[in-house]
Structures are given as structure tokens and as C-alpha cells.
Amino acid sequence: MKTTYNIIATMAFTALLCACDSFLDIKPKGERIPETAADYKTMISHYEIQKMGETYPIYLTDDCYLPDMAFSTGSQGLNTITPSIKRLYTFDKQVFGDGEDDAFWSSSYSRIFTNNVVIREVMDASEGTTAEKSAIRGEALVNRALDYLYLVNGYAKHYNEATAEADAGVPLLLNADISQTNLTRTSVKGVYQQILADLNEAETSLPEEINGNAFHATKDAARGLRARVYLCMGNYAEALKAANEVIARHDTLLDLTRYEVVKPAGMIGRTNVPDADANPESIFIKYAPYVFGLSSKVFPSDSLLNLYEDGDMRKVLFMAETFRGKTLPRPIWVPYVRANTAVSTPELFLIAAECEARVGYMPHALALVNKLRAHRIKDKGYVSLVDKDSVLNFVLEERRRELAFNGFLRLIDLKRLNLDPRFATTVKHVGDTETWVLPPNDPRYVLPIPQRVMRFNANTMTQNER
């Protein structure tokens, strides 16, 4: 049976972001029944489906700094941020009040609902070839896998093979019915198994190449995401295999040393660095929920700033000590470039390099990182190391430099690296009169399930300890 659906608005997202009575805090609104393959492609092409990779969890990490009082108009401080962001930054056990919406949860499940409709129905659509309909379905599978990867990394403990089968993950919904009640949380292992199943199935039906930009998925989109999934699972051999398979076809890097700040006092158009849709590094594009992500919303921490060398164009182009004509006490994050939160060449280089350093050939790890650095740092990007632990540490530092403020990848990295005492990090947020501390593996690394969702499933769903 076809699902009544508004293919123009995709879903009533304005309603979704407000209070609504549903076990998942989502509320689809039907106005039209999709019939053709083109209708279903419109659904997965909608702007709201292209947004993925929530940014607010970054405030739990060691990458960001917020002053007690905002330094200037438009910049953030503890006196100007929302109550929920302040609670995150100060590691409060409560994050959202009863009347506050958690857009990460609600928008993720809204997208999952949309993709479930497409997965279930598109092959029966009129018009369109079987190959076209299979590609649409494959992309919906990739979309669903990526949403679940973010959800399970936000609302559950990090994947640990020893405990993943017992650790509570997130509700795993694989159909288009949101009327279900009394839901339970699938285990972390179960969620990861479904993510891999979706990606494996998607790969068989997606094309190798597409015409146009990378907003639509190819086989390499599925392979690239699989590399990220296996890295999260600590399966370095499989992560390396998947990353290398994509790098063999996509090894182009943007040379940031050729770009510059063209409007030092500006915001949009401050640099001539291209957005993701015009960036040759983009393999599969998703944007952060907000137009320019965390631009002007956060200050890089001292520990992050100290990782960048002189001549590192990531610091030159994406950070500034002046904002809106005012000199600030410290650099602010102001790239004003629409970055890609899905699959890109630099992340795959870093996945492959980390896996080579752990289970592969150390010179390959260095070669990958040095190639990336040659496209990021003027004159002196090359590094020579011989000790395996030193190489691994350097790769992890490079990952932090390159992926700073990209969705909440740093939070995922902290959670996975905290499982290894060699890399465990105590996060400290220092204010004028108070310091807030988040020890390794603290339960506050895991976001709480929204309170409205818990009320609808009070007898079957467990809340995260914080």
C-alpha cells in the first residue's frame, strides 16, 4: 500500500521541530501519494534529507572553548548560548528541559521515516527503469545507515566488541509505520549489524558513477561509509580494505595552499574555498543542519589551536582573530564554507592511515598523511617518523586537525579512543571562576533519550545513565 506523502515538502518538518505527540517525536503529514520513480527521487533529494551530522554534541569535546561572556556581537559565550548548549558545555547531567526539543533525535528519525518509505515502495513505482529505481532505493539505504550511525554514536556507548551485544543502542525502525508504541532499544551491536547490512545491500544496486555533483550516492558512498563504520567498530583490517577501495578511484585533494582570505572582515565569502558541492574531495555530500555549521558559534580550544603549525592553511583560512571588524582575544572558528559531513577523500586518507599504523604498513600511513599535509601546509608539511606509536599518535593528531568541527566526529573519536588507555582524554572546560571536567568513559559522553520519547515508551525503553 502506498504511503500518503507530500513529495514537495517531503515531511512537515516545521511541525517536527515543535512539540508533537509521537513515540519518536516525529509527525509526518500526508498530502500526496508518490507514484513515479521521479516522485521518490524527489523525496530523497529534498533539502531536509541532505542535512545530516548534528553539530551540538561538539560542545562536549576538547575542541571547543566558550568564554563566560561573549567577546563580541555575534560570537558565543556562556551568557549567550541556549540553556541546553550551556548544560552540555558544563557537563550537566541534564541536557534538555521537558519543553525543549532535541532536533538531533527528531530530525534523524524524520529522515529515517522518509527513507523507509522509499526503501519499501520505490521498486513498485510507475515509470523509471529497474536500474533507476534500484539506485534510488540504494541511496535511501545509505541515508538510513548514516543516520543510524550518527544516532547510535550520540545516544549509546561506543561500540565495544566485549559489551556491544548488551549495551543499549537506539530504536531500530525499518518500516514506515510511526504508530508503533512500547518500543525498545536495539543493542549497539544490532544497530551496527543493520548499518552494515544496509550499506552492503546498497552497494549492489548503486551505480559506480553519476553525472553531476555528489549529492546522490554511488557504490563508493556505501564503501566509504563502511570504512567509517568499521573504524568505529575497531575492525581496522576491514576499515582499511574499504577505504583503500575508494581511494583507488578518489585520491584528489584540494590544495588549500592555493586559497586565501579575500574578505578579512567578512562572513559569507570570507575565503575563496569552495563549498562541498564544488569540492573535488566530495564523494557523497551531506550538510550540517545549519547553513555554515558552527561558523562563529565556537572558539577552538587551546589544545586544538596548539596542534596547528605556522603555515597551516586550515588555521589561516578557517579561523580569525577579528570578527565583524572587532579584534578578539583568541581565534574564532569562521570558515563560512558548507562542509561535507558524509564521505570525503581526506577522511578516507585518515582512516586508511590510522589503520595502516595499527595493523598495516607504517610507511603507507606516513605517505597518506604527508600527501594530505602537502595540500594543507605551506612549505613544511612533510614529517618523517620511525616509531610505530609515534606514527599512530601523529595520524590521530592529523585527524583532529583536519576534521575539526565536522559534525561531531571529534566526540565519536573521543569515545572510541577512550577505550584504549594510551589515548584516553580528560576533557576540561575552563571558565573564569570554574572548571568543568569530563573523565574518560564518563556516562555523560552519551546523550539522553528525549524525555517525550521516554514518556511514550516508559515501560519498555531505558534511559541513559548520566
What is the predicted function of each stretch?
Residues 1-20:
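Sec-dependent bacterial lipoprotein signal peptides
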Residues 30-35, 63-71, 157-166, 170, ...:
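Short, surface-exposed recognition loops and adjoining beta-strand edges that mediate ligand/DNA contacts
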Residues 112-115, 192, 199, 243, ...:
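Inward-facing hydrophobic residues that define packing positions of alpha-helical scaffold repeats
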Residues 20-67, 304, 380-381, 420-466:
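Membrane-proximal, proline-rich intrinsically disordered regions
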Residues 37, 41-57, 190, 233-345, ...:
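Extended ligand-binding clefts on enzyme/binding-domain cores
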Residues 82-155, 186, 199-209, 336, ...:
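Conserved, well-structured interaction surfaces
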